[in-house]
Amino acid sequence: MQRRDFLGTTCLAGAAALTSLGDVAKAADAPAKEWLELRTYKVEAGAMRTRLETFLRDAAIPALNRAGVATVGVFSAMDEKSADLTVLLPYKSIEAFAAASRRLLADTEYQRAGAECLNAPKTAPLYTRIESSLMLAFDSAPKVEIANKKASRVFQLRTYESHSDAKARKKIEMFNTGGEVALFRRLGMQPVFFGETIAGAKIPNLTYMLVFDDMDANKAAWDRFMKDPEWTKLKNDPQYADTVSAITNTLLKPAAFSQI
């Protein structure tokens, strides 16, 4: 190899190494993103719902806190048409998510406090079924945020489905680098989380949750959002066309013992 070729090759290799090191440095500087499990406990109104709430409050949530899940959110439908409970569990890592159930089973205090429910007979189950989805938090909202603990607070849970992985990825980009999350923040629409659904129903999709002081604040914030020039520009950007094929919107209220 001639000296000139050698120097050229060496410079390219060095540049590649620097780029790689730069990427590693950026990754190291970026905040660790949480893994978010969103559960729906299917229950009947009345005694079954009450028993599940007691179990969550007195046994499951304290045990989850001991297992490293620092904050657990528990919610029910504002319109009360369904008795189901929605539970949000943020994990520090995918390994923490995988280990959570084993840690609970090994927790003697959990076994003691929840014995009646954990050992419930088939004729009187604690719940009908659990539906669960696993999400990875967005770059623009890497961790669950708890900024509002007012008794009147209202949560809004929204899921955006896409007809392809490529369009789903583009919608996530619209939130992150496109500025939609930043727009929410500017307009006082406080995020709880934004997550890309990795496993669950109706994928590909993303799901996010916002919190408002009350229903009046919810309506006023969305009115501001729809009229904002930045949103008008963003929604008409052709690169984000046809990124959403279906939207699910649910208004929730927190349980008295919810940590979110």
Model-derived features: positions:
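N-terminal secretory signal peptides and thylakoid transit peptides that target proteins
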Residues: 1-14
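Anionic, Ser/Thr-rich low-complexity intrinsically disordered regions
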Residues: 8-9, 29-32, 50, 160
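Surface-exposed interaction/gating patches
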Residues: 42, 137-215
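Short, glycine- and small/hydrophobic-rich beta-strand elements in well-ordered beta-sheets
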Residues: 21-32, 61-86, 92, 179-207, ...
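Short, cationic motifs built from Arg/Lys/His that form the positively charged side of catalytic pockets
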Residues: 3-4, 39, 158
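Hydrophobic, ordered structural segments
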Residues: 41-52, 58-66, 70-147, 162-164, ...
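A short, compositionally biased domain-edge/stem linker segment
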Residues: 19-28, 139-145
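C-terminal functional regions that serve as terminal interaction/effector modules
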Residues: 31-34, 180, 184, 200-260
